[in-house]
C-alpha cells in the first residue's frame, strides 16, 4: 500500500488542480452572447434553468454547471426577471439573492391622460387599472391626481400599486402645503389649487417664474377676471389639437376648458402639476401683475396694465 502512496498523491493533486481549474472557469467565464432578459418561473429547478439558458448557447458543460451549483450553493434560486449580461457566477448570485431587473415608471412633469396612457402601454406592467379605474377620478379626469416623479417596479407589477402610491404622495403634499395658504389667496379648495397648479405647470418650467405666473392668476381670480390661459384651450381640444389656436378656438363656448370664455377655473386640472407648481398656486399670494407674454427665449414679460401688455406683445410676438 505504501509503495502506491506517491502515485495516489499525484492523482489527488492532479484532481485538485483539475477541480480548481474547473471552478475558476465557472467563476470567471464570461457569457459570450448579447445580453438578454430571462424570466425564472416559480419552482424552476436548476436543470430547467440550465436547459432554458445555457444548454442552447453551448456555454457550459452540464457537469461543470452542476458542480459549480453545488459547490457554490446555488441550489435555491428565486423567481423573477433577470438580466443575463455577465459571467455565470454573477448571474446565479443574482438569482440566489433575488436581484431581479428593476424598471422605471416616470410620470413626467405636466403630462396628461393621453400621453400617460400611451406610456403605460409600453411598460412591463400588469394593467389592472384600465382607464385609471383604480383611482377615484374627479369628472373622469386623472390629471392632477398623480404626482410627477420616478417610481420603480419589477416586471408584471400591478399598475394600481404605482398609481395609488403616486396619488397618495400627491394628496399628502397638497394637505401639507394647504396649511400654509395665505389669507389673501382666493382659492376655495385643495382641488381648485391643483387645477390652478396644472395651468401654471403648462405655462412655464421655470420655478422662479412659476411663483410670478401663479401670482398673476391669483390676482385675476381675486378680481374675477378671466384667466385667458392658452394651455386650457389646448387641453379642451385634445386629442385632436393640431398645433394652432385660432380665433374661433378663443371664442368657442363649447370648449369647457376655454378660459377665454368661462369666468373662473376649468372643471378639472389639465396636467400633472409638480410640487413647484402646487407651491405657486397654493402657498402664493396675488401680485401686482395681470398680464404676461412669452419673450421668445423661454421666459415671460409681466405687465400691470393692458396697454403695457399690448406693447410687449407687439415687441416680442409680432416681430
Model-found features: residue ranges?
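Conserved catalytic or metal-liganding residues and their short signature motifs at active sites
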Residues: 1-238, 269-276, 280-288, 295-319
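Short acidic (Asp/Glu) and glycine-rich catalytic loops that position anionic groups and cofactors
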Residues: 193-194, 255-259, 291-292
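Conserved SxxK-family serine transpeptidase/carboxypeptidase catalytic domain
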Residues: 228-270
Amino acid at each position: 500500500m505504501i509503495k502506491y502512496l506517491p502515485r495516489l498523491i499525484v492523482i489527488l493533486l492532479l484532481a485538485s488542480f483539475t477541480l480548481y481549474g474547473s471552478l475558476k472557469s465557472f467563476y470567471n467565464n464570461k457569457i459570450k452572447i448579447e445580453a438578454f432578459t430571462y424570466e425564472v418561473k416559480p419552482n424552476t429547478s436548476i436543470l430547467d434553468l440550465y436547459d432554458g439558458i445555457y444548454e442552447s448557447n453551448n456555454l457550459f458543460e452540464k457537469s461543470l454547471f452542476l458542480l459549480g451549483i453545488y459547490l457554490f450553493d446555488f441550489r435555491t434560486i428565486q423567481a423573477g426577471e433577470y438580466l443575463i449580461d455577465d459571467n455565470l457566477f454573477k448571474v446565479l448570485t443574482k438569482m440566489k439573492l433575488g436581484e431581479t431587473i428593476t424598471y422605471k415608471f416616470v410620470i413626467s412633469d405636466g403630462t396628461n391622460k393621453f400621453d400617460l396612457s400611451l406610456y403605460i402601454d409600453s411598460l412591463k406592467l400588469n394593467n389592472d387599472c384600465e382607464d385609471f379605474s383604480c383611482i377615484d377620478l374627479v369628472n373622469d379626469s386623472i390629471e392632477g391626481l398623480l404626482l410627477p416623479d420616478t417610481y420603480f417596479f419589477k416586471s408584471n407589477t400591478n399598475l394600481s400599486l404605482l398609481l395609488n402610491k403616486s396619488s397618495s404622495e400627491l394628496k399628502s403634499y397638497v394637505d401639507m402645503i394647504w396649511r400654509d395658504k395665505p389669507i389673501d389667496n382666493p382659492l376655495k379648495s385643495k382641488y381648485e389649487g391643483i387645477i390652478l397648479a396644472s395651468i401654471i405647470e403648462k405655462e412655464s418650467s421655470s420655478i422662479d417664474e412659476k411663483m410670478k405666473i401663479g401670482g398673476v392668476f391669483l390676482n385675476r381670480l381675486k378680481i374675477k377676471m378671466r384667466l385667458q390661459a392658452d394651455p386650457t384651450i389646448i387641453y379642451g381640444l385634445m386629442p385632436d389639437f393640431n398645433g394652432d389656436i385660432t380665433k374661433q378656438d378663443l371664442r368657442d363656448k363649447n370648449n369647457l376648458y376655454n378660459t377665454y370664455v368661462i369666468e373662473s377655473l376649468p372643471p378639472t386640472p389639465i396636467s400633472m402639476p409638480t410640487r413647484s407648481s402646487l407651491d405657486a398656486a397654493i402657498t402664493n399670494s396675488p401680485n401686482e401683475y395681470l398680464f404676461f407674454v412669452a419673450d421668445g427665449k423661454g421666459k415671460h414679460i409681466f405687465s400691470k396694465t393692458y396697454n403695457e401688455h399690448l406693447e410687449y406683445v407687439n415687441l416680442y410676438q409680432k416681430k
